[in-house]
């Protein structure tokens, strides 16, 4: 399986993502610069964390207009896996692949620590190797990770089982309904604020994030067999 790691000016978690895929997962991964216009030959797209375009205007607002984004939209429309982590999640809301928005943390401070997450939906292509309700430990590192949506959107997310991860015990940023990660209605686009790529090795704190990437590979292999 081959992953595309999209790089924007200001991305700073792209190396972590590449390392997680190549060295921990054992799959292929390549950087794709934001000015490129093709994702031919790739099976999954990863939008890493960081501060794309310096977070000017607002997080993800300028990245929305990058040359690669129409291809990311087309990729998602084809049903292929798209994962946005932290700034990547913010970008996914800006381009309309996911509902809602990410706003300033309610304490107005940058948060960097490992937090407990509850797996709220273990039936997606990103979570099938987790148990429903399982508590995992994954790092967060953000200043604008407070997920917000209106009441109608929140009701729809709940009814469609689109809430994939929630903060357990303590909500670090004020997100509505403790939301840490959501998928689109089709289930092939996941946005999350915590960093699974930073939880793939025991030596640096645990491997709870690795199963997310392993789930994607498993789903992809099953699709190839059934194609």
Swiss-Prot record:
Return the PROSITE patterns for the record: GATASE_TYPE_1
Q: Where in the cell is it found?
A: Cytoplasm
At the highest ranks, the source species' classification is: Bacteria, Bacillati, Bacillota, Bacilli, Bacillales
Query: Which organism does this record belong to?
Result: Listeria monocytogenes serovar 1/2a (strain ATCC BAA-679 / EGD-e)
Where are the annotated coiled coils located? none
Q: Per the database record, which ranges form the Glutamine amidotransferase type-1 domain?
A: 2-226
Keyword set, alphabetical order? ATP-binding, Cytoplasm, Glutamine amidotransferase, Hydrolase, Ligase, Nucleotide-binding, Purine biosynthesis
What InterPro entries does UniProt report for this protein, alphabetically? Class_I_gatase-like, PRibForGlyAmidine_synth_PurQ
Catalytic residues in the record: 86, 195, 197
Give any Pfam family that matches: GATase_5
Which reaction(s) does its UniProt entry say it catalyses?
N(2)-formyl-N(1)-(5-phospho-beta-D-ribosyl)glycinamide + L-glutamine + ATP + H2O = 2-formamido-N(1)-(5-O-phospho-beta-D-ribosyl)acetamidine + L-glutamate + ADP + phosphate + H(+); L-glutamine + H2O = L-glutamate + NH4(+)
The protein here is known as Phosphoribosylformylglycinamidine synthase subunit PurQ
